[in-house]
Every structure is written in structure tokens, then in C-alpha cells.
């Protein structure tokens, strides 16, 4: 079962010189119930690899439920979380006196502050526990966009930050052995991940000469990203996985585009494009 509820609103305030401010509020509620039951047919006498039953046949439901439940790897969970999100949005627009001429600027900023509360009831074999966590997150975003020289030149700069937090089951001491060759552990020390993104777009055009140039570049970096590390046991062939926070994940790249006519009659046009991107991934 999965339920969600959202409610919120904004109120716009208009000021002189094309300035607008909009304070806002949003409430989110989430409720999730999950039951995972693992049954081991090989635990029944006569139903294993050396059994006499043909492939595809199943035992009765009573036998199945009473004797084959893998309590160690079966669980029930009930997750409830809610968030209060207050935000302040502001924008300013510097319009030219004549449409399509002069200089035009647009600036906007969104400053949201969010409080998140989560609680998880979890049952697994002999484990019966409740875990609660609280998060305060600030996820700002900014944009500066300008055009000048009769709108034939311009630049667009953007930045935003996002925060993500680990699953609540990560903060419960769990050892999952449902796949005997790939054992999975939790990590109660995981931190929230923070991602920063910035991009720049610039163009330089000449409508009279039909020459067009533009370039776009972006950079993204993640702090405390979650990676799955593992230890391999050569004697048994078993891998034991455990999530960890890592730093150093980023990517940077962009493209450059240019076009121009090759002859005076402008029957032939040269189009060129160059793009590149570098990914740096840190693992365990």
C-alpha cells in the first residue's frame, strides 16, 4: 500500500521596476506498508533437488506457509514521512524600451527550506524496532539570463542544488542472505547526498551575415554519494555488499556549434559541431 497527499500554495507580490516576490508553502505526507515473505521450497522433505515431484508441481498452501517461510529474510515495514516546505521565489526583468532592441536581463532565485520527518516500523525475524529521522534541507536555485546587441548575443547561467537521503532501512542493522552468494548489509552511518549543478549557455549571432555561434557547458558534482562496496571471499565465492558514502563523483562537458554560408549566394552552408563530456566516478 502506498499513499501520498500534497497541499500548498503561493502568494504573489508585485513591486515597481518589474520585481515580483512569491512566498510559498507545501505540505507532503507519505504512507507506505510493505510485506516481503520468502519461502524456501527446498526446505520441504521430498521437494528438494533430489525429490520425486515433477517440475512445476507445488505443495499445498498449508505445507508451504508452515514449513518453508524464511523468517531471517522475510520482513514487514511501515513507513510514514511528512515534510513542510517553505520557499521564497523572486524574479526581476529588465525590459528594453523597444521590443527586440537594446539590452534585456532576467534574474530569478528560488530559496526553499524543507523540514522532513520520517519514521519506520520494521519487523524481521526476532527484530522489532522503530527508527525516526529528521532532515532540514536547503535546495536553492538561481538563474541569470541576458540578451543584448539587438538580442543577437546572450548568456544564460543556471545553478541548483538538490539533497537526497538514504532509505530508512539503511539505518537498521540488517543482514540479507536470501541470495547466498550475494549477502547485503546495511550501514547506519550513511549521510545525506548533496548534488550541485551549474550550466552556462552563450550565443553570438549575426543575422545580416547569417553567422551563428553558440556554446553550452555544464558541471555537476555529488558530495557523499552512495556506492555499493563489497568484499569477496575467494574460498566460498560469496560477495558481501555494504553501502558507503564516497566523494569525487563529477561530470563536466559541453558543446560548441557554428554555422556560416560558404558563398555569396548563400547556397552552401558550413555547419560544425564539437561536443565533449568527462565523467569521474568513484567506487569502492
Residue ranges and their predicted role:
Residues 1-284:
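Exposed, low-structure sequence patches enriched in small/polar residues
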Amino acid at each position: 500500500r502506498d499513499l501520498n497527499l500534497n497541499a500548498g500554495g503561493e502568494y504573489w507580490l508585485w513591486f515597481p521596476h518589474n520585481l515580483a516576490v512569491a512566498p510559498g508553502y507545501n505540505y507532503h505526507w507519505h504512507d507506505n506498508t510493505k510485506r516481503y515473505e520468502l519461502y524456501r521450497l527446498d526446505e520441504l522433505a521430498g521437494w528438494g533437488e533430489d525429490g520425486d515431484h515433477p517440475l512445476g508441481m507445488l505443495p499445498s498452501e498449508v505445507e508451504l506457509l508452515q514449513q518453508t517461510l524464511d523468517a531471517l529474510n522475510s520482513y514487514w515495514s511501515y513507513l510514514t514521512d511528512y515534510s513542510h516546505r517553505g520557499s521564497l521565489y523572486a524574479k526581476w526583468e529588465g525590459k528594453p524600451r523597444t521590443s527586440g532592441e537594446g539590452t534585456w536581463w532576467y534574474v530569478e532565485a528560488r530559496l526553499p527550506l524543507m523540514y522532513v520527518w520520517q519514521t519506520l516500523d520494521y519487523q524481521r525475524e526476532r527484530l522489532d524496532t522503530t527508527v525516526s529521522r529528521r532532515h532540514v534541507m536547503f535546495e536553492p536555485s538561481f538563474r541569470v539570463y541576458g540578451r543584448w546587441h539587438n538580442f543577437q548575443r546572450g548568456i544564460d547561467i543556471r545553478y541548483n542544488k538538490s539533497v537526497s537521503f538514504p532509505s530508512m532501512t539503511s539505518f537498521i542493522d540488517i543482514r540479507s542472505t536470501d541470495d547466498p552468494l550475494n549477502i547485503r548489509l546495511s550501514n547506519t552511518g550513511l549521510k545525506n547526498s548533496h548534488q550541485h549543478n551549474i550550466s552556462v549557455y552563450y550565443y553570438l549571432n549575426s543575422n545580416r551575415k547569417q553567422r551563428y555561434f553558440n556554446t553550452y557547458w555544464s558541471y555537476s558534482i555529488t558530495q557523499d554519494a552512495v556506492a555499493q562496496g563489497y568484499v569477496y571471499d575467494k574460498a566460498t565465492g560469496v560477495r558481501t555488499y555494504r553501502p558507503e558514502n564516497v566523494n569525487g563523483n563529477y561530470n563536466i562537458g559541453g558543446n560548441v556549434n557554428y554555422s556560416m554560408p560558404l558563398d555569396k549566394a548563400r547556397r552552401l552552408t558550413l555547419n560544425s559541431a564539437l561536443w565533449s563530456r568527462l565523467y569521474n566516478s568513484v567506487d569502492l
